[in-house]
Design a protein with these regions (language model features):
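Class I SAM-dependent methyltransferase SAM/SAH-binding core
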Residues: 45-47, 51-94
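Core SAM-dependent methyltransferase catalytic element
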Residues: 200, 218-236
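Short alpha-helix
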Residues: 171, 183-205
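Conserved class I S-adenosyl-L-methionine
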Residues: 1-39, 53-57, 74-77, 134-169
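A short acidic, Gly/Pro-enriched loop at the edge of an enzyme's catalytic core
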Residues: 93-104
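A short glycine-rich, Lys/Arg-flanked "PGG" loop and its adjoining helix->strand segment in the class I
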Residues: 118-133
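A short SAM/SAH-binding and catalytic strip from SAM-dependent methyltransferases
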Residues: 104-116
C-alpha cells in the first residue's frame, strides 16, 4: 500500500478492540447487517476487510466469505481471530477471485482508502455473478471535504460544520490514537459515476443515524451524518 496502513496497523487493531469503534457499533453495524437479512446470499467478498470484523459477522450469519486486504498485519490478525476463515493479502484493484464467483461484494468503509476507485469498482463488478449485490458503507463526501475545517464556531458562537473544495478529488491525511492514514476525498458524483459506468444499478441509499446511544457525539452525528450506505446491483 501503504497510505499509512502498514505503519498504523497495530494502533488500528488496538483502537478497534474486539467490539469495533463507535461509528461501526452505533451507526453502521445494524443497517449493514439488515441489508444481509434473509436474502439467501451464499458467497461474499469483503473488499478491504481489515482485521476481518465484518467477515466474522457474515460467517456467523451463514455466508461463505473471502476477506481481502493489502495490509499484511491486518490479515494476520483476521486469521488469528478466525482461523477457519479465508483471508488473503491482496488489493481491491486486482482481486484474486474468478469472474462471477460471488453473489455479494462488501466495502465497509474501504472505498475511501482506495487509490484507483474505478479499478476497484470494476473488480467488484467482475467477481459478482449476474444480479449480485455490491453493499457499500462509506464516509460522506462532505465529511471528507471538511478537513481541516470541520466543526467550528460562527461569529455568533453557534457551532457549525464547514466544508471547502468539495469538488476537488484529493488525498486527506487523518490522525488519531497513534493511527495516521490517507483517505481520499471524492465528491459523491465521482462515486456515483464510477459505479454507474461499471454497469451497476442503485437499489438502496441511506444516511444512517446513531442508535442505542445519546450524548454530544450522537447529537453531532444526527446534525451531520458521518456515513452513507448504498446497495448496487449487477445487471442480470
Amino acid at each position: 500500500m501503504t497510505g499509512g496502513w502498514d505503519e498504523s496497523a497495530q494502533a488500528w487493531i488496538a483502537s478497534l478492540g474486539d467490539e469495533g469503534d463507535w461509528g461501526r457499533r452505533h451507526v453502521l453495524d445494524a443497517p449493514m447487517r439488515a441489508r444481509l437479512g434473509d436474502r439467501g446470499f451464499r458467497r461474499a467478498v469483503d473488499i478491504g476487510c481489515g482485521e476481518g470484523r465484518f467477515c466474522r459477522m457474515m460467517r456467523a450469519a451463514g455466508l461463505d466469505t473471502v476477506g481481502i486486504d493489502p495490509t499484511t498485519a491486518l490479515i494476520d490478525r483476521a486469521r488469528a481471530l478466525d482461523p477457519d476463515g479465508d483471508y488473503r493479502v491482496g488489493r481491491a484493484e486486482a482481486l484474486d477471485l474468478d469472474d462471477a464467483s460471488c453473489d455479494l461484494a462488501v466495502s465497509y468503509l474501504s472505498l475511501v482508502d482506495i487509490d484507483d476507485l474505478d479499478a476497484a469498482v470494476g473488480e467488484a463488478h467482475r467477481v459478482l455473478e449476474p444480479g449480485g449485490i455490491f453493499l457499500i458503507a462509506n464516509l460522506q463526501s462532505f465529511n471528507t471535504a471538511a478537513d481541516p475545517i470541520g466543526w467550528d464556531h460562527g461569529p455568533d458562537g453557534t457551532r457549525r460544520f464547514s466544508i471547502d473544495h468539495y469538488l476537488q478529488v484529493r488525498p486527506v491525511w487523518i490522525a488519531w490514537r497513534g493511527i495516521r492514514i490517507r483517505n481520499w476525498h471524492r465528491p459523491l458524483s465521482t462515486y456515483m459515476e464510477s459505479l454507474l459506468d461499471a454497469g451497476f444499478t442503485l437499489r438502496h441509499f441511506a444516511e444512517p443515524m446513531p442508535y442505542g446511544v445519546e450524548g454530544e457525539k450522537a447529537d453531532r452525528y444526527r446534525r451531520v451524518p458521518n456515513f452513507l450506505l448504498m446497495e448496487w446491483q449487477k445487471s442480470t
